A protein has these predicted regions:
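A short secondary-structure junction signal
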Residues: 73-79
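Non-catalytic, alpha-helical, charged scaffold/linker segments
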Residues: 88-89
């Protein structure tokens, strides 16, 4: 959702959501290392390997990505991309993932500087960089929270005013020009993937739909 709506939802989430749904951001859960929000079901457990060691809400979730406009000027774009790289490396100190040689070196340096203890402060700076920069904005809309880089940058007309569609029995709003949006991001998205490419990128240590993550944390 656009940043303005995202901020409005963040303010209203506690009164809009049932008590067992937790709106997780770096503000509501300071150790959560995400530049976007998650609606977590606190009655359940989904502990991903990369963040298993973090003391935060680990309920089953859906991601909520804020959409921001890209700067118009090339220099501002370059500056923003540099800031993003720096902040991502600083936040990465809390993740349990395999890294290349350079990544291990940067991680060691950032941990020496104590960034593993400053997740919320780093994310606040990161959010300000992508959402509150000065200067003119272009008509390019960015999802900075997802992992596919500039494939997440789309012309505003892709989103348009939105389009109502049915997803697993639910009426949801999708991009107005969803075909153009999906084609830019995935190519021939209507064709089935080869079997060897049908692999997820989320790996968990515990998944339990009937027991709260808080119970596992006590063990």
């Amino acid at each position: 959702m656009y940043r303005e709506d995202y901020r409005r939802f963040s303010e209203k989430a506690p009164e809009l959501l049932p008590e067992y749904y937790f709106w997780q951001t770096y503000r509501t859960d300071p150790k959560a290392p995400f530049i976007f929000g998650k609606v977590r079901d606190s009655r359940t457990t989904y502990i991903e390997k990369s963040v298993a060691g973090i003391d935060m809400n680990h309920g089953v979730y859906i991601d909520v990505f804020p959409l921001d406009f890209y700067p118009e000027k090339r220099f501002s774009q370059w500056k923003l991309e540099l800031q993003k790289k720096i902040y991502k490396h600083q936040i990465a100190t809390v993740y349990q993932v395999k890294r290349c040689f350079l990544g291990r070196g940067l991680n060691t340096l950032n941990r020496f500087l104590g960034y593993q203890h400053r997740t919320a402060k780093t994310l606040a700076k990161y959010e300000k960089a992508i959402a509150d920069y000065s200067g003119k904005r272009s008509d390019i809309v960015c999802n900075h929270g997802n992992w596919q880089g500039k494939l997440e940058y789309s012309p505003q007309w892709h989103y348009g005013e939105g389009h109502w569609a049915t997803f697993e029995g639910l009426k949801v709003r999708v991009p107005e020009n969803y075909d153009a949006y999906l084609t830019q991001k995935y190519g021939d998205w209507r064709s089935d993937l080869p079997e060897e490419e049908k692999q997820g990128h989320h790996f968990y240590t515990i998944c339990d739909l009937h027991r709260s993550y808080a119970d596992y944390r006590k063990q």
